[in-house]
A protein has these predicted regions:
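Gly/Pro/Ser/Thr-rich low-complexity, intrinsically disordered segments predominantly at protein N-termini
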Residues: 1-178
Length: 178
């Protein structure tokens, strides 16, 4: 699709087929490739963990990879999984898309993502104050990026702790070994 500066929500929804995923980035539609079975399995396990966290902490809401969030740049991003404070939804009603960035974005590195695409996504998240969690399935490594702190790395034998999430601890060894 040609580069455009604006796109209506309806045009965005009609940009691809139902089975496809895409984002609006820098004035153009970027289609996302299918993922490996390993990626899909890891994603399902991660969603289960975050769902359990949200059931225990009702002030948080988890979203899967089809939820669309609006960045201050105007880009529409779809993290693999995301967490949002429930208080950010006025009156508790959830809109079709969020006119804000998530509080926490979980991303699984995909071999088809170019370094430039990853950097642009990281920049969008950084500029919007999003806590970023990047999983590298091959290296069994996690990068935790706070908007205001140095990058932190977690190896599979360490629990992932995100201090902005109360009582959150993710057993990486269990997650990577499943």
């Amino acid at each position: 699709m040609a580069t455009r500066t604006t796109l209506t929500w309806e045009e965005f929804l009609a940009a691809g087929e139902e089975w496809q995923r895409w984002e609006w980035v820098d004035g153009r539609i970027e289609f996302m490739s299918s993922v490996s079975l390993q990626h899909g399995h890891f994603l399902a396990l991660l969603i289960g963990c975050l769902g359990s966290f949200c059931r225990a902490h009702s002030e948080w809401v988890a979203f899967g990879s089809n939820a669309v969030f609006t960045m201050s740049s105007g880009n529409w991003r779809m993290p693999d999984v995301s967490l949002v404070r429930r208080a950010r939804f006025p009156g508790g009603a959830m809109p079709t898309k969020a006119d804000f960035a998530p509080d926490v974005a979980f991303e699984i590195h995909s071999p088809s993502d170019s370094p430039g695409q990853i950097q642009r996504k990281r920049k969008d998240y950084q500029q919007n104050g999003v806590v970023q969690v990047w999983f590298d399935l091959e290296k069994r490594l996690v990068e935790l990026v706070y908007p205001d702190r140095p990058l932190q790395y977690f190896e599979e034998y360490q629990p992932l702790v995100i201090d902005t999430l109360p009582d959150f601890s993710l057993d990486l060894k269990e997650l990577y070994s499943a």
